[in-house]
A protein has these predicted regions:
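Outer-membrane beta-barrel channels and translocator barrels
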Residues: 73-75, 104-106, 133-135, 176-180, ...
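Outer-membrane beta-barrel "beta-signal"
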Residues: 99, 370, 375, 397-411
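Transmembrane beta-strand segments of outer-membrane beta-barrel domains in Gram-negative
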Residues: 138-290, 348-349
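Residues that define the transmembrane beta-barrel architecture of outer-membrane proteins
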Residues: 62, 91-95, 120-124, 163-167, ...
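Transmembrane beta-strands of outer-membrane beta-barrel proteins
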Residues: 78-80, 109-113, 137-141, 183-187, ...
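Outer membrane beta-barrel transmembrane domains
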Residues: 149-152, 188, 192-209, 218, ...
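Periplasmic polypeptide-binding modules associated with outer-membrane biogenesis and secretion
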Residues: 1-86, 98, 114-123, 263, ...
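Transmembrane beta-strand segments that form the barrel wall of outer-membrane beta-barrel proteins
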Residues: 53, 76-86, 97-103, 107-119, ...
Length: 411
C-alpha cells in the first residue's frame, strides 16, 4: 500500500540523499524484500556507518510508516605515506600526503587530492564527483599534473625534464545493482598535454610531438561487472580508448600519432578460505590497434605489475599480465599480520618499434603486511626475478625490495 517516510537520524546526513535512494526501493505496492535489499545496499555506502529501519502500520488504513535510524560515517580522511614505488630514474623514494572527503557539500559529493614528491618528481592529483541520480550515477572532474626531472647519475647532467597535465570529465552510471551483482558503464574524456626539454631547450623524445609538445585527446568507454558473496569477489572491467583529433591535439603524419585505438581488459578476484587465508588474482591485457603515444602505453615491472623488477622495466603498446597472491594470517585477527607469497608474469610487444629484449618478465616472492596500530600499516615485498634483464642499479627497488609505510586518520 501507500507509505509514509520518517527519519530518526543521528547525524547531519541530508535527508534527500538517503530519501532519494529509499524512494527507489519503496515504490507502491511495497515489497519488503526489495526494501531489505535496498537497505543492505545503503549499508555498503561509505557515507553510512549504520542504518536501521522499521516498517510499522500507519494511522491510516493501507499506509505504512518506515522509521529509519541512520549514523553517518566519518567523511574526512587524511593519509601520509612513504614508499619506494616510483621509477628509479626520477627517484624511487616517495612521500605522499592525501586528503579525501566523501560529502563535501552535503550532497554525497566526493573530493580527493594528493601531493607526492621524490627527488625528481612533483605530482598533484585532484578529483571531484557528484551523484546525479538514486542509482549513484556520478559526473566528475579530475586533474593530474606531474613535473619530473631525470636524476640518475648518467643522465642528470643533461637536465632532462618532462611535464604532463591531464584534465578530464567523467560520467559513471550503474545500470544494475543488487547485493551480489553490479553492472556499470562509464564515459571519460581526457585532454593530456605533455612538455619535454633537454638542457632547457624543447626536445621531442617520442611521437607525436612538435617542439617538445604533445597534446592528446582521448575518449574512453568502460564497462564494469562485479559479483560478490561473503567469501568471494569477482570483478571485470573493459575499457576502449580512442585517440581523437580534437581540442588542439598534436597533428603529425607519422606513427604514433594523435589518432589511435586500444583496449584494456582487467579481471580480478579475491577468495577467502575457511581458515581466513586469502587468494588474490589479477589478469590484465592491453591490445592496441595502432602504435601508441608513450603516455598511453602499458608498463611492466614494479610493485603493481611484476615484482622483482624496477618500475617501467618494459613499456610497450600491447601487454599481458597475470598475478596470483596468497595471504596467510599469522594472528587471531587476520587483518593484523599477514605473510604473502606471489607469482607474477607479463609480456609486451609493439606495433611499430622493435620489441624489447627481453619482452617477458616473471617473478616470485614473499611479502609481509602489518597493521601496527589503528590506521598505521607497514608493507614489505621481496621479488625474485625469473628472467634476467640488463640492470646495473643497486637501489632497493632494482634489487626487488619494495616497502611502504602508511598512516590514515578519519575525522
Amino acid at each position: 500500500g501507500a507509505w509514509g517516510l520518517f527519519y530518526s537520524v543521528s547525524s547531519e546526513e541530508p535527508d534527500y540523499y538517503i530519501r532519494s535512494r529509499l524512494e527507489n526501493v519503496t515504490r507502491t505496492p511495497l515489497n519488503q524484500q526489495t526494501l531489505q535489499n535496498g537497505l543492505a545496499l545503503l549499508q555498503l555506502d561509505p557515507l553510512i556507518k549504520t542504518i536501521q529501519a522499521e516498517l510499522t502500520p500507519g494511522s491510516t488504513d493501507g499506509k505504512s510508516v518506515l522509521l529509519v535510524n541512520l549514523e553517518e560515517a566519518k567523511a574526512l580522511s587524511v593519509e601520509v605515506s612513504t614508499d619506494n614505488y616510483r621509477p628509479q630514474n626520477i627517484g624511487s623514494y616517495e612521500g605522499t600526503i592525501a586528503l579525501s572527503h566523501g560529502n563535501v557539500l552535503g550532497w554525497g559529493d566526493k573530493f580527493s587530492g594528493e601531493y607526492s614528491i621524490t627527488e625528481g618528481l612533483n605530482l598533484y592529483n585532484l578529483h571531484y564527483n557528484l551523484p546525479i541520480n538514486p542509482m549513484d550515477g556520478r559526473i566528475g572532474l579530475h586533474y593530474w599534473n606531474t613535473d619530473s626531472k631525470i636524476t640518475e647519475t648518467l643522465f642528470n647532467i643533461f637536465d632532462i625534464r618532462n611535464q604532463t597535465e591531464t584534465l578530464g570529465v567523467e560520467y559513471r552510471q550503474p545500470i544494475y545493482r543488487t547485493l551480489q551483482t553490479e553492472w556499470t558503464l562509464g564515459l571519460n574524456l581526457d585532454i593530456r598535454n605533455n612538455r619535454s626539454s633537454l638542457e632547457g631547450v624543447s626536445f621531442c623524445f617520442s611521437q607525436p610531438c612538435i617542439d617538445g609538445k604533445t597534446n592528446l585527446t582521448v575518449l574512453r568507454f568502460s564497462q564494469e561487472w562485479l559479483n560478490r558473496t561473503p567469501n568471494q569477489v569477482f570483478a571485470a572491467r573493459s575499457q576502449l580508448n580512442f585517440g581523437i583529433n580534437a581540442f588542439d591535439s598534436t597533428v603529425v603524419n607519422i606513427e604514433p600519432n594523435q589518432e589511435f585505438f586500444s583496449w584494456l581488459g582487467q579481471f580480478q578476484f579475491v577468495n577467502r578460505f575457511s581458515n581466513n587465508w586469502l587468494l588474490l588474482g589479477r589478469f590484465y591485457a592491453q591490445i592496441a590497434g595502432d602504435p601508441l603515444p608513450i603516455i598511453e602505453q602499458f608498463s611492466l615491472g614494479g610493485i603493481d605489475t611484476v615484482r622483482g623488477y624496477a618500475k617501467n622495466e618494459i613499456v610497450t603498446d600491447n601487454a599481458l599480465l597475470g598475478s596470483l597472491e596468497l595471504r596467510i594470517p599469522l594472528t587471531q585477527d587476520p587483518e593484523v599480520l599477514q605473510i604473502t607469497s606471489f607469482v607474477e608474469g607479463g609480456t609486451g610487444w609493439n606495433n611499430l618499434l622493435p620489441d624489447p629484449d627481453p619482452a617477458t618478465l616473471g617473478g616470485i616472492g614473499l611479502g609481509l603486511r602489518w597493521l601496527v596500530a589503528n590506521g598505521l600499516t607497514v608493507r614489505l615485498d621481496y621479488g625474485i626475478p625469473l628472467v634476467s634483464v640488463d640492470n646495473s642499479g643497486n637501489s632497493l627497488q632494482e634489487q626487488g625490495v619494495y616497502f611502504s609505510v602508511r598512516y590514515r586518520k578519519a575525522f
